[in-house]
């Protein structure tokens, strides 16, 4: 997988906005990507140094439309912590 395939989109919520003060950035990533691949992708795309990566897996929710039921897509989020001497990611600046 290429770096652009691994990182899908940034996750911008109240909690992720608070974590940005600690140089922690949240991304939705490919479900098949591991921590090492996420780290390499962030370093390649944004030109920063990554200290640590935490990964969260979410199961799909059961949804029903009339009598038909199914599941939404499963998701995977990564919280990436940058090193102290690394520059910030401009993508998240508002």
UniProtKB/Swiss-Prot annotation:
- The entry's protein name is Large ribosomal subunit protein uL23
Q: Which organism is it from?
A: Lysinibacillus sphaericus (strain C3-41)
Family membership, please give it. Belongs to the universal ribosomal protein uL23 family.
Specify whether rRNA-binding is a keyword of the entry: yes
Question: Which GO terms of the cellular component aspect does the record hold?
Answer: ribonucleoprotein complex; ribosome
Q: What is the lineage of its organism?
A: Bacteria, Bacillati, Bacillota, Bacilli, Bacillales
Q: Which SUPFAM superfamilies match?
A: Ribosomal proteins S24e, L23 and L15e
Keywords from UniProt, A to Z, are: Ribonucleoprotein, Ribosomal protein, RNA-binding, rRNA-binding
Locate the coiled-coil region(s) and give their ranges.
Answer: none
- One term of GO molecular function: structural constituent of ribosome
Any one Gene Ontology BP term? translation
Q: Name one Pfam family in it.
A: Ribosomal_L23
**Role according to the record:** One of the early assembly proteins it binds 23S rRNA. One of the proteins that surrounds the polypeptide exit tunnel on the outside of the ribosome. Forms the main docking site for trigger factor binding to the ribosome.
Highest taxon above the source species: Bacteria
Fill in the subunit field for this protein.
Part of the 50S ribosomal subunit. Contacts protein L29, and trigger factor when it is bound to the ribosome.
């Amino acid at each position: 997988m290429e770096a652009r395939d691994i990182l899908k989109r940034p996750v911008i919520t109240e909690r992720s906005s608070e974590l940005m003060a600690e140089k922690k950035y949240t991304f939705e990533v490919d479900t098949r990507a591991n921590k090492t691949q996420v780290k390499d992708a962030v370093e390649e795309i944004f030109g920063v140094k990554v200290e640590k990566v935490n990964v969260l897996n979410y199961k799909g929710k059961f949804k029903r439309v009339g009598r038909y039921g199914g599941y939404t897509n499963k998701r995977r989020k990564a919280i990436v912590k940058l090193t102290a001497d690394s520059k910030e990611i401009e993508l998240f600046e508002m």
